[in-house]
C-alpha cells in the first residue's frame, strides 16, 4: 500500500511549459504555515511563464477594490496573501558550464512526491554541452514538526568528472504577487506589496526583513547554506538579494551535498520576527538533517494512522484519495491566525482568502480524523467574531454577527455583492461546523467557551433577517 503514497512525475518529458506550471502545484511543499511552489532551483530559460512563489498562511496586505461607483456596504479594500522572499534559487556550475534542464542532454529525469516521507524529489542525470556528466538528487521538505522551516538537500554526484564546482545559492527579497487580469481568481495587477527594509549577513546566514505597504506587518526570512566538504565561501549583497557562492573541487569518488536551510517568520504570530527567525534557524541547525526528517515523518505517521484509507481494485482512485488527504494536511493552518484557502498554500488563487469551503468541504474531514485541527479552525473564526458583528451592522442588522463571504482577517473582501456579501449562508456553514465538531468530540468545554458564542450570534442574525409567521 505504501507505493500508493508516492506520485511520480506527471509532466511531459519535453519540459512543456504548461506541465511545468502544473508541477508547481502538484509538487509544492507546505505544512499549513508556509507554502512553496515547486520550481527548478536553477531557473528557466527566457520566455517561460512560471509563478515562483512562497507564502505564509494569513500573511497579507490591503489592496484596493475598484468600483465604477461607490456603494454603501460594499468594501473598497481587500486582503491579499503575499509572496514572501524567494529562498529556492540554487545555480550550479561545473568547470564553468552552468547546469540547466534546457541545455546539454538529459540522460535521466524524474520528479516524485513521497507522501510517507513528506518530501518532493527531483533526480537528474545530465551531460553538459562539453560532455561532462553529473547526477543530481534534490529533496525538498516543509517541516510539519518545525513549521517555519523549509529544507532543500542538493546532492551532486560527479560521474567520471574531476574539476571545479561552483554553487550559487540565493536569497531574494525582491518579490511581487502573481497577477492575471483575465482570471477572476487572481489579482489583476502585479504589485510589490512587500518592501525589504534590511538585508544582512550574520554568522554565515542571510537575513531579509520586509514590511507590508499598508497592513503594518513584517516578515523575516533567514537562509543558511551548509556544504558537505571544504570550500571557499563568499557572500554578495545586491539590491536586497544575497548570494552565497561556494567553490570546491569535485571527483568521481565522492558526492557533494548542500543543505539549504530557510526559515520564514511573520509578525502576526511572532512579535519580534527577526529574533524568532534566528532562534528557529539555530534550532534547525542544532540537530542532524536525518533528525529533522525523523521528526517530520513522525508527524506524518500520526496523520496517516488517523485517516489512511485504501480502495481495493482501483489503485488510481486510491492514490487520488490519498493525494487529496495529503494536500488537506499541507493546506490547513495549525494555529488560529490562518485557515484554509481554496488553493491551500499552493498558489495565489482567490488571493489566499477563506470561504465556506473550509467549513463545508474540508473541516468535516478533520473533525472525524484530526479534531484538534478542526478546533483550531473554529478558533480562527471566533477570533474574527467582532469583525462579523461589525459586518452585520454595516449590512443594516440590529444584532447578531454576519461572517464575510471571503476574508483573511475577518473583513469582507468581495466587491461583488450578489456573489459576496449577499451569501449569508456562510453563517450557517460556520454554525454547522461547530455543531458537527461537538457531536464528534463531545467537547462541551470548548463549546461553552467559544463555540456557543458563534452559534448564538449567527442565530441572532437569522432572526433579524427573516420574516417569520406563526
Name each model-derived stretch:
Residues 155, 322-329, 348-352, 356-367, ...:
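Contiguous, well-ordered alpha-helical segments that form the cores/surfaces of helical PPI scaffolds
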Residues 161, 165, 268-275, 307-311, ...:
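Inter-helical turn/loop segments and adjacent helix faces that build the functional surface
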Residues 332-346, 372-432, 438, 445-449, ...:
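Helix-terminus loop motifs that line ligand-binding clefts
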Residues 89, 98-104, 314-322, 359-404:
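Carboxylate/His-rich catalytic cores and anion/metal-binding grooves
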Residues 175-182, 347-352, 383-391, 457-461:
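Short, mixed-charge aromatic SLiMs
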Residues 258-260, 296, 320, 377, ...:
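Alpha-helical packing segments of well-folded alpha/beta enzyme cores
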Residues 83, 147, 317, 354-358, ...:
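Active-site-proximal structural scaffolding
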Residues 1-350:
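Acidic/polar, glycine-enriched structural segments that form the non-catalytic walls/loops
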